[in-house]
Amino acid sequence: MKRMLINATQQEELRVALVDGQRLYDLDIESSRSEQKKSNIYKGKITRIEPSLEAVFIDYGMEKHGFLPLKEISKNYFPENYNCDVRLNIKDILREGQELIVQINKEERGTKGAALTTFITLAGSYLVLMPNNPKIAGISRRVEGSDRIELKELLSSLKIPEKMGLIIRTAGVGKSIKSLQWDLSLRLKHWNAIKKASKKKSAPFLIYQESNVIVRAFRDYLRQDIGEILIDNPKILDIAREHITALGRPDFINKIKLYTGEIPLFSYYQIESQIDSAFQRKVRLPSGGSIMVDTTEALTAIDINSSRSTRGADIETTAFNTNLEAVEEISRQLRLRDLGGLIVIDFIDMTTISHQKIIENKLREIVREDRARIQIGHISKFGLLEMSRQRLSSSLGESSHHICPRCTGTGTIRDNESLSLSILRLIEEEALKENTYEVHAIVPIEIACYLLNEKREAVYAIEKRQAGGKTIIVPNKNMKTPHYLVSRIRKGEQIRSMSYCLSNVRKNKIFNNIKKEIVDKKHKLNSTLTNISLSDDSFDKQKEEKEKFLRKKNYNNSIINALFNNKNLFFKFIVWIKNSFLKKHIFVKNESFKRNIFQNKKNILFAKKEEFNSIEEIHKKDNQVSSIDNNKKKQLLNKVKKNNNHQYSHVFDNNTKYTSLKKIDFQKNTIDFELNSLNFLKKNNFYIFSKYNFLYTKKYAKNKFKDFENIKSQNDMICYESFQKDLENNTSFKKKLLYNIIFNNCYPNNILVNINSTIFQIYKNSEFFKFFPIKISILMTPLNIFSLELILEPSSKKCSSFKENQVKKRLRINNYKKLNSSFIHKKNNFVKNSVLWPKKFTTEEIKINHLYKKNKKNTKSYFFETSFKYKTVTKNISKLKVKLTSKKNDYLISNQKKLFLNKTLKKENTKNKSSAPITKIFSDVFLSKNQKIMNSSIFLKKSNKKIKNSAGAHSATNFSTSPVKKSE
């Protein structure tokens, strides 16, 4: 028994299947993402007339204009008194801007617009009305014999209006004249409503939309041989009963039933696997053979293969049986896939002509059940049969498939070697053109590896012939073969860019095609080096609070305010120090620093002062740290020198005070005023300097109160002394120190911070210094460490923080620290929990000049072998030699990325230096949302000799999925 199965369990897709027992022979799928437009009626206007095509283009409200040929234009739109016997000229018939009522005859396909017609067809249950085509009046071609004679008599009895055509459908067989006249009256009302609606509005707009898949299925597929209609959705069941009554098919109401089984409807009738075969290229035959279906722009090719088929006594019989079996499957697949247009079938060669005739007749007999019009030819001497099938709607592949972006629908791609050689030839062609400055090639990683390794000599030869020009090859992991992009940069069309994480890279206008959000991440923005608090409040809120209290006037700091009145001179001095001294002597001359810079490794540590976001008593100038005099003799850090054993020694100048980095642990809780100040005097104190941004603790060897007034600053550095014994025993002295302390030759605007949340302000030339107890919690971060290149380039905002936690005492080092590092910036967790572990200790005696005693004092130096853990990657670092000047509270501070502990730098072999292009592939983390890439042009400028003989500086970034085209 034949059934109509309607599956509506998924609201995005509604499927209608026609089955004969458990064999699927027709399928219609309607999806919410692909709405059918065929048979829709629009009011459009002519936008362009093409006499060469004898057609016009119609704007009917869609993106692509419709195509209307002259043969599809009704005479109702011809001018009056036009002589149709003369050769027609489309410009004499129609004009631009003229409005027409059109119907979609063929839907859009690829780049082609929809095919339109002015011959409107209104399909009903029993007949089809053509209101503006009087030439057509007849009966469906499927009706034969006595039924056809009977319908002709009924057709002559129908009252058809003038200048209208009519076709009686197969469903009209056996119906009375009254039923046919009732259906005709409905179609006439429909046409009158369309004409009335078209006059209310100007073109373009939609007048009538074709019914949904359920109505179309009832109208087109319902025949008397359909035994039952099963629907698995109660809501669709009610809608189906309403539509079938409106269509005038009350005889099918009792056949509509609700399916309530536990097994899905299509699975129960075992048709899911048959539906899947309609999406496959290869379809198996029961005997073991197969058919291959390939659709192209011009036609659909179907190839028949015997495969494992062994049916038949000889090869001729096997070929005949396989072809006969394939004919039935081909006719079914044409209906399931809804393939239209030209179809070519390649049969297995048969020498017997009678077998060929049987195959042709079998195919003609089977396709009679198809609703589409089909024309079939004969099998040629090459074994090919040509046939055409009417396009009823978009095929299953067009509505549910999309073209592969990699192979563009061909199914094959070019191999890597052939593609690489083709790109190399294109690079050479572009490089040898006149006025060429650079040639950029953005290629997949596989192609880049081949060009930079196998063809490095060829790339270098191209650069030589280019007379100084560069060839930049950029691997892009988001690009897959066979896609690539080769662009030529002319000398007069240079655009500065920060692409590929290189400086001074220039790109042409193709750069504008890259996605905007990716470009913004790579663009260098002017910003300042800021310190962000690790508080619960947002950064914007903290910034607002900071600006609020900075606006408040502090009358206690008039001397400091006077100093900062001349801002230009002060900041020019700071900029001059950075540009002339630090960049010249540290970056350029020091090979270790240059290496680390080009590898984006932050190896030099600097502690940045803390920002007090909630202090009202301290003026803006108080919260800044003044710099000391720029004296080269007092450098805190000299060049890093190499030893024969590949160890690095942290050496200080003899005239510089020996200091050690100490822990700052700001407390959140408010401490009593007297206790706070007393703890400050008893314990170690901290000083912050902005020139080198190092945090130091100063201690005197003298511990007597009588020497206090005689202490003076040495080497232009602020001094302070801990008087533990005297303070503990002299209570009167404690009280006195709560308010002022004698202090000589202090530098202005230096802030002393105690571990108990007390801030001390040093006054210039005042012989005393004050402190301000904080009555609220200070929102402070731990000790902030910044790399040297960030200090020199204030446009960068990336920073990191290090928090120290006490661990057990190990060997001779007291309070050795475990260092945990993390970025302050939110969403910028680049390295998490990098740990510096002590593994090996050795000692040796080193004599140095003591700070305040004339005699010399021996100190100990320790060696550490360290290991950093970056997530799952472990990197071993070379040994570091650090001088410790105190046995108490000395800590080793480390950065999150190798710091001073750079990898062991072996001696450079200049003789065997390769001239190959240098390729650097960076991680996605450098393109994180909040990170600002700094411009390293100054570093590249100082190291031109390193890349002078290379084939080009190469780098890989994930800046875009570049368009695949060649730029001129």
UniProtKB/Swiss-Prot annotation:
Residue positions binding Mg(2+): 303, 346
Domain S1 motif: 39-119
Annotated positions binding Zn(2+): 404, 407
Cofactor: Zn(2+); Mg(2+)
Cofactor note: Binds 2 Zn(2+) ions per homotetramer. Binds 1 Mg(2+) ion per subunit.
Top-level lineage group: Bacteria
GO molecular function: magnesium ion binding; ribonuclease E activity; RNA endonuclease activity; rRNA binding; tRNA binding; zinc ion binding
Single GO cellular component term: cytoplasmic side of plasma membrane
Topology within the bilayer: Peripheral membrane protein
Main location group: cytoplasm
Cell inner membrane in keyword set: yes
Region (Required for zinc-mediated homotetramerization and catalytic activity): 404-407
Segments for region (Disordered): 947-968
One biological process term in Gene Ontology: mRNA catabolic process
Enzyme Commission code(s) on record: 3.1.26.12
Catalytic activities: Endonucleolytic cleavage of single-stranded RNA in A- and U-rich regions
Pfam families (alphabetical): RNase_E_G, RNase_E_G_Thio, S1
Function text: Endoribonuclease that plays a central role in RNA processing and decay. Required for the maturation of 5S and 16S rRNAs and the majority of tRNAs. Also involved in the degradation of most mRNAs.
Subunit structure: Component of the RNA degradosome, which is a multiprotein complex involved in RNA processing and mRNA degradation. Within the RNA degradosome, RNase E assembles into a homotetramer formed by a dimer of dimers.
NCBIfam families: PRK10811.1, RNaseEG
Descriptive protein name: Ribonuclease E
Species of provenance: Buchnera aphidicola subsp. Schizaphis graminum (strain Sg)
Gene name per UniProt: rne
